[in-house]
Amino acid sequence: MSKFTLKVLWLENNIAIAIDQIVGNGTSPLTSYFFWPRNDAWEELKAELESKPWIAERDRIELLNKTTEVINYWQEEGKKHSLSKAQARFPEFIFSGSN
């Protein structure tokens, strides 16, 4: 998955996830942010990735699996843990937000 990274907006009542493509030493936005639980971020992200046929299926699956991990962590642990603990749990992703 080194071609892509998740950007996570860590909020008290929601989590938002976007995907960036890694280009050189930086990133380029690939999707907008999708929110959970306000909307079904996973389903929306899946549809967005499927609309980009140039993304390999294995990359789509890996991105969706990682999205599931982040959403589950937020649901189960997020309200008890700070943004810095979430960053420590998922160091390969880009986090911003509150708490």
From Swiss-Prot:
Gene name as annotated: ycf65
Binding partners and assembly: Part of the 30S ribosomal subunit.
Domain of life the protein comes from: Eukaryota
NCBIfam families: PRK02724.1 (NF002740)
Cellular-component GO terms for this entry: chloroplast; ribonucleoprotein complex; ribosome
UniProt cross-references to Pfam families, sorted A to Z: PSRP-3_Ycf65
Protein family (similarity comment): Belongs to the chloroplast-specific ribosomal protein cS23 family.
Principal location: plastid
Keyword Transmembrane helix: no
Subcellular localization: Plastid, Chloroplast
Species name: Porphyra purpurea (Red seaweed)
One of the GO BP terms on file: translation
Coiled coil residues, start to end: none
GO terms of molecular function: structural constituent of ribosome
Keywords: Chloroplast, Plastid, Ribonucleoprotein, Ribosomal protein
Protein name: Small ribosomal subunit protein cS23
Purpose of the protein: Probably a ribosomal protein or a ribosome-associated protein.
